[in-house]
């Protein structure tokens, strides 16, 4: 095999080295800046094999079915962190079990968090007075749409929140949030 002499091998000059160093640094910074953007559009899924997001309490701890039901009675609607960290109501049904659906607590009018008013037995938005029934269906505006639904599943005592993409059972229409 023939060996190349040192005169045949091109050397990297100072200018080429500085260009390579600048390009490498700029590429590293750009990729570092793209990571949070990519994470926003494709978030890592927390939770069990079913693919849901683990519901979290106000301290960020995962919610368990036994722990939740020990502190909440039938008819309670209480907030957890659900999909994308949005406030989501977990509903304890009349049988004293966690309901099969949860409600995103963000008002469809201007994005305020809608509290549950147990005295009035409905959700009432503090910003402009929109009202939603016990299932999150809008009953009084100015909110144009019902609260978004989410599936709630229990996997090994862990409460999971999943995207709702089926027909909205309250309106018999396709979900506006999917």
Swiss-Prot record:
Name of encoding gene: petC
InterPro entries: Cyt_b6_f_Rieske (IPR023960), Rieske_2Fe-2S (IPR017941), Rieske_2Fe-2S_sf (IPR036922), Rieske_Fe-S_prot (IPR014349), Rieske_Fe-S_prot_C (IPR005805), TAT_signal (IPR006311)
Sequence ranges assigned to domain Rieske in this UniProt record: 65-161
Keywords per UniProt: 2Fe-2S, Disulfide bond, Electron transport, Iron, Iron-sulfur, Membrane, Metal-binding, Thylakoid, Translocase, Transmembrane, Transmembrane helix, Transport
Catalysis performed (reactions): 2 oxidized [plastocyanin] + a plastoquinol + 2 H(+)(in) = 2 reduced [plastocyanin] + a plastoquinone + 4 H(+)(out)
Disulfide bond annotation, renumbered to this chain: 112-127
Sections of the chain in a coiled coil: none
Miscellaneous notes: The Rieske iron-sulfur protein is a high potential 2Fe-2S protein.
Family listed: Belongs to the Rieske iron-sulfur protein family.
Assembly: The 4 large subunits of the cytochrome b6-f complex are cytochrome b6, subunit IV (17 kDa polypeptide, PetD), cytochrome f and the Rieske protein, while the 4 small subunits are PetG, PetL, PetM and PetN. The complex functions as a dimer.
Task performed by this protein: Component of the cytochrome b6-f complex, which mediates electron transfer between photosystem II (PSII) and photosystem I (PSI), cyclic electron flow around PSI, and state transitions.
Positions with a binding annotation for [2Fe-2S] cluster: 107, 109, 125, 128
Protein name, entry field: Cytochrome b6-f complex iron-sulfur subunit
Database matches in Pfam families: Rieske, TM_PetC
Organism: Prochlorococcus marinus (strain MIT 9515)
Membrane spanning stretches: 20-42
Places the protein is found: Cellular thylakoid membrane
UniProt-listed Enzyme Commission number(s): 7.1.1.6
A single BP term in Gene Ontology: photosynthesis
Any GO molecular function: oxidoreductase activity, acting on paired donors, with incorporation or reduction of molecular oxygen
CDD domains in UniProt: Rieske_cytochrome_b6f
